[in-house]
Amino acid sequence: MTTQVVNVIGAGLAGSEAAYQIAKRGVQVRLYEMRPVRQTPAHHTDKFAELVCSNSLRANTLTNAVGVIKEEMRLMDSVIIRAADECSVPAGGALAVDRHEFAAKVTEYVKNHPNVTVMNEEITEIPEGPTIIATGPLTSPDLSAQLKELTGEDYFYFYDAAAPIVEKDSIDMNKVYLKSRYDKGEAAYLNCPMTEEEFDRFYEALIAAETVPLKEFEKEIFFEGCMPVEVMASRGRQTLVFGPMKPVGLEDPKTGKTPYAVVQLRQDDAAGTLYNIVGFQTHLKWGPQKEVLQLIPGLENAEIVRYGVMHRNTFINSPNLLRPTYQYKQRDDLFFAGQMTGVEGYVESAASGLLAGINAARLVKGEEPIVLPPVTAMGSMANYITATNAKNFQPMNANFGLFAPLEKKIKKKAERNEAYATRALETIRNFVNI
C-alpha cells in the first residue's frame, strides 16, 4: 500500500465520492470540510453531501442520460448512488431521497472508512502533494482568491436557487390530486390545478413580488436547470405554462380535463410529511414569497418550513484548465471535481468526484489515469467540460447530446436513447475493476 496521502478539500457530493473511491483503493485520504467550523449561506448541517437545492437526483430510467450516468456509477460502486438508493422516497420515474437520511448515510460510509481521516478546518491555501479540490459553488473567499491566482482566470458567477418546502398537513387535499405525468411510475406528485383566471392572478403577483437585491459586483447569469421562477416568469406569461407549470399528462381525475396550469409538489422526506414545490426555486423575499405561494390552489394555508433561497455558484473555465481526467493541466497531482468544473447537477458532480478519485488513487500508485470514452455518460461529461469552446463555456447537465454519435443513425428518439444507454453500459463494464 502506498504511503502517500491524497488531500480532498470539500465533503459535498463530489468530495465525498472522491474520498471514498481513493480510500477503497488502499490509499490514505485527508478529507477537509470547513463545516461546522465555518458555515456557508446555503448549508444548514455539518453532514457530508448535504443537498441544498432539491431532494431529487432526477431521472432513474435508462431513457434519460442522467439515468444512464447513475447506472454507470452503480456499476462503479458509487457511495453517493448507493446511499441514494437506500434513502429513496417515492418520486415516479425519478430518484429522490430523504435528504437528512441521505447525508447521514454518506457521512457514515465515508467517515467510517479506515483509510479516511476527516479534518474539520478551512483550507485557505492549495496544499502541496496529491490534492482534489471539490469545494463546490460556495468556495470560501480565501480559497477562491488562491484559485483565481492559480488559474489566472476570472470566475463566473450565477445563482442556484432552492425551492420552498411545505408541510403536507397544511395542504388542502380536497383541491389537489395524486398523479405522475402520463401516469409514469407510481402516482408520486401532488398536483395543484389552476384555471386560466387563477393562473393570471398568480402570474401578476409573481412578477410584481419583491426579490432580494443582488450585490453590484455579481452578474446575473442563471443556469437554465435551476432558474428562479420569477426570472422565468419575466420572460413571458407562457414560459411557466410550458415550463414548471406545464399541465400536459396531468389530467384532473375529478373533471377528466387537463387544467390550464399545474403546480407539482414532490415528497421531500421519507416520512412523507414535507413536500417541495417542483421547479419553484426563487429569490423572492420571504413575505412576498408566502403571499405568492398561497395563491396556488391547495396552498392557501400552506405552512412553509423552508423558504426558497438563492446562493452564488462558482466555476472555472475547465476547457482551458483541465484534462478529461479532471487533472489540472499545469500540475499533474492537482485535480478538480464537482460543480466547480462546470458539470451541473448533483449526480454529475458526484460522477466527476468518482472519476477524479479513481485517477488520484491511480496517480499515487504509479498507474496511468483513465479517460472514460465519450460513449459513456461520465466520459461525455468529462469530454464536454474539457473539449468545448472555452470562450462560451457554461455549466451542463448530462444529456444524450453530449454522447459520441451512434455508428448508425436511429430516427426514433426512444430507440436512439436506448442504443446510447446500451452502448454506454457495455463500455463502462470494461472499467468496473480498475
From Swiss-Prot:
Reaction(s) the record says it catalyses: uridine(54) in tRNA + (6R)-5,10-methylene-5,6,7,8-tetrahydrofolate + NADH + H(+) = 5-methyluridine(54) in tRNA + (6S)-5,6,7,8-tetrahydrofolate + NAD(+); uridine(54) in tRNA + (6R)-5,10-methylene-5,6,7,8-tetrahydrofolate + NADPH + H(+) = 5-methyluridine(54) in tRNA + (6S)-5,6,7,8-tetrahydrofolate + NADP(+)
Protein name, as recorded: Methylenetetrahydrofolate--tRNA-(uracil-5-)-methyltransferase TrmFO
Heme as UniProt keyword: no
Family: Belongs to the MnmG family. TrmFO subfamily.
EC main group: transferase
Subcellular location(s) per record: Cytoplasm
Native organism: Bacillus thuringiensis (strain Al Hakam)
Membrane found in the keyword field: no
NCBIfam families registered for this protein in UniProt: gid_trmFO (TIGR00137), PRK05335.1 (NF003739)
HAMAP family: TrmFO
EC id: 2.1.1.74
Chain positions recorded as FAD binding sites: G10, A11, G12, L13, A14, G15
TM regions (residue ranges): none
GO biological process: tRNA methylation; tRNA wobble uridine modification
Keywords: Cytoplasm, FAD, Flavoprotein, Methyltransferase, NAD, NADP, Transferase, tRNA processing
Cysteines paired by S-S bonds: none
PANTHER family: GLUCOSE INHIBITED DIVISION PROTEIN A, METHYLENETETRAHYDROFOLATE--TRNA-(URACIL-5-)-METHYLTRANSFERASE TRMFO
A Pfam family matched in the record: GIDA
